[in-house]
Amino acid sequence: MSRHDSLYFADGTLTLQDLDGTLFNVYRHHFIAKSGFFSGMLTLPSPDQPTPIQNASNGISDSTAVPLPPNFTTVEYEKFLNFIFNVGSLDIPLVTDLCAILKTSHFFAAESGVQYAVHYLQAHANFPAALRFRMGCDYSIVSWVKAAFDDLVAVPVIDMTVEDEALLGTQAFRALVLTQAKVTDHRMSLAVCPPLPTHATWCRNPAYCQTQWESAWTSIAGPLGWLIKEELSGAEIHNKLDLWVPMAMTGECRLLTCSRLKEDLKREEVIIDSAVTALIRLVVV
């Protein structure tokens, strides 16, 4: 056994021990107030009820330390207790720290820890899509599952790591591959059969306008090029269409035609949403 360097308080009133033999000495009342799990375990019962913690592990000394559940590592317990007792600085929390706090806080019914971790992970720039998906599944955060799957659809399978695949799991990875194939088929059908331009009522030269549209379409810098780029999501293509100005095409005709193309692209959203809905029923806890 060894005492933790920063989480063994000299005036602590509750000694805890993890599976690796690390001892933590913390403040019992504060711990009970923060964690529903420990509140139920450590609160003294009425006189006619048995004590939940026997004398052999009552937490009043190192030799009678309360054993912590073996579900988490010493590092994960550190992150959890650092948060609970406000030890150290988490001004710019790392994704790994936040995930550890979410996992432990969820298990120990520490609502403030769950809210803290979710709040910072939600907008964290370095929260990988595969990890977001896994955490969303494990902790029933459906919005994370959807957002992560949307992002992953735009990632070629060949670029995914073994770690990504492990985080997704077999069912989700298979659903992702099938969804990517359906999206690709839909995009290719649009690419090889470009929509006819929609002309404004006052378009003076529809034939010329159509020629300009077809010429711009076949450019790799236009819609055709965007459709064959797997790394572009449907939303990104929508944004590009809003800014795209093919040469010499009447402005109103361009807007009408791009609007129609956006409607065709919405089929991609339906494909992805259907896959996510089915997946959530299977993998979200």
Residue ranges, per PLM feature:
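Long, hydrophobic/aromatic-enriched structural stretches that serve as scaffold segments
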Residues: 58-119, 199, 203, 207
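Long, hydrophobic, well-ordered secondary-structure blocks that form the structural core
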Residues: 121-123
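BTB/POZ-protein C-terminal extensions
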Residues: 1-67, 89-90, 126-285
